[in-house]
Amino acid sequence: MSSFDYRSRLKELSARYNPEASILVNERMQSEDHYLDTDVVRYVKRSMRAVDDDYTKRTKDAGEAVKQHLNNELINVTYEYQGSVMTNTHIKGASDIDLLVICEKFEDTEINRVRDCLKTPYGYSNIQLSRLRNYELSFSLYRGDSREDLSNLRRQIESIMISKYTICDISKAKSVRITNQHLHRDVDIVTSSWFQSLEYVLDGMPKEEKGIKIYNKNLGFAEGPDFPFLSISRINQKSSESNGRLKRMIRFLKNVRTDSQKDIQLTSFDINAICYSIPVADYAYLDYKQLVYLLWSTMYHLWYDNKLDKLKSVVGDEYVFKGKPNKIEALKALEDDVFKIHQDLN
């Protein structure tokens, strides 16, 4: 007897992946696994798949529409996206998307750390020392008011979005949320600024390593830094090395979490870290059944072998479970569900 009602789970997954009940999308989903003879196999394989391209395109189009409205009126800003849509690990056909509106008037830096390194230049290569020197020589202190710049930018974004969208929520501290009623998508518009870390300078200032700080209007200043582009780059790169298997594992865990009867409080950030921590060599050639077993084994040994305190984010700048007992219990709950699915597959 199966541990779960997979037929019911398949209906929930189908509604999530194909919320508009598109006949074409449904036919594509069905055609890929019509030969599979059990519901558990169908559930696992569908849970690992990406959302249909048509749905994902509409999500991105909603973001581009917002960008165009802002671009018509704002100056001294650039635009970037962050989140699971950018790694194609989202599990909702009607996913929302985060649009970063980045103030170009100033950039936060770690200039003091750069100068400290130059005072004691040990352990760095000649190339790195050259980068540090050039960075210090080109550095100039911003004479404006960065907090006021971000506050003004947030107010401008609110004003533009209110004028363009009937459904617009400006109450959130870190973002403005609009609903594109034509495309049936939400877009979160995030006021932010650039952050240049010491590591960014040492590595030659690659774009993906550039950080951001997010403006909190309730506090009146920017929080962070975060490194969304590095996380996106690392997940995309590592998944390409295994023909997409990393992303399949991420989607699978997110779907199992979402379909669970338990309230599993793990975020995409947490699940990304769990899957990313697995060496590519361990799964580069595994099939879907073996991937399920690997995920169960990984989560089980994380807590059983007391390794949770060591697990860091994809970027490596934050501990995921350390000092967070509720998350540890959530991991155990997810691990238990995955183990039952593994048993049902075999």
From Swiss-Prot:
<dbReference type="GO" id="GO:0005525">
    <property type="term" value="F:GTP binding"/>
</dbReference>
<dbReference type="InterPro" id="IPR043519">
    <property type="entry name" value="NT_sf"/>
</dbReference>
<comment type="function">
    <text>Cyclic nucleotide synthase (second messenger synthase) of a CBASS antivirus system. CBASS (cyclic oligonucleotide-based antiphage signaling system) provides immunity against bacteriophage. The CD-NTase protein synthesizes cyclic nucleotides in response to infection; these serve as specific second messenger signals. The signals activate a diverse range of effectors, leading to bacterial cell death and thus abortive phage infection. A type I-D(GG) CBASS system.</text>
</comment>
<keyword id="KW-0547">Nucleotide-binding</keyword>
<comment type="similarity">
    <text>Belongs to the CD-NTase family.</text>
</comment>
<keyword id="KW-0548">Nucleotidyltransferase</keyword>
<comment type="function">
    <text>Cyclic dinucleotide synthase that catalyzes the synthesis of c-di-GMP, has no activity with other NTP substrates.</text>
</comment>
<keyword id="KW-0808">Transferase</keyword>
<keyword id="KW-0051">Antiviral defense</keyword>
<dbReference type="GO" id="GO:0052621">
    <property type="term" value="F:diguanylate cyclase activity"/>
</dbReference>
<keyword id="KW-0342">GTP-binding</keyword>
<dbReference type="GO" id="GO:0051607">
    <property type="term" value="P:defense response to virus"/>
</dbReference>
<protein>
    <recommendedName>
        <fullName>c-di-GMP synthase</fullName>
        <ecNumber>2.7.7.65</ecNumber>
    </recommendedName>
</protein>
